[in-house]
Amino acid sequence: MKRFLNHRLLYVLLSSLIACTIQAIKLEDSPFSFGQKYRGEKFLIAGCGWDKVAVIDKRTCRFEWVHTIGKGEDCNDVEVTREQNILYAYTAGARLITPGQHVVWDYKVGGNEELFTATQLFDGGYLLAICGHPARIVELDNNGRTIKEIHFETGIETVHNQFRQIEKTRRNTYLIPLFGSGELIEMNVSG
């Protein structure tokens, strides 16, 4: 019965996170001291309206690691990087932190912009996508310095309704899901 309740608790917690991002963590070479006993049974979670980024043990439903984000910093994208750091997007920026909670870099956006995409690229750099007028795709090097910035218009007036989770393909194009129009567009690096 207790096991059922733990799984029920995990289900309720995960389903209550609106726009929740969940990533199963690969534990090989992980700095998280969760051991190899439950290989692949940890989840990195975050969600809009929740003030944390956390690692949860699937079996016990216990928090193994928690990072509290600031008031109003809704997290919409989170991942463990190849270097085993935590990268997450929050409405006013993106942040890369170590498992020890040290901030490696913190990229902030302007007052009329919102950032909902932060992901590590194939080459080890980072991709950030910023809703605004104009919207921007920003690529950072592995130290968090801007190396490329592309400006474009989405045709969607309300900044919050523009897009989420942009992806860069191996063909050097960007896939952009436009919320306001229901379209998926592909854009090259020239914009």
Identify what each model region corresponds to.
Residues 1-2, 144:
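Accessible peptide chain termini
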Residues 2-11:
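Bacterial N-terminal signal peptides that target proteins for export
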Residues 11-19:
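Bacterial N-terminal signal peptides
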Residues 25-191:
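Secretory-pathway ectodomains
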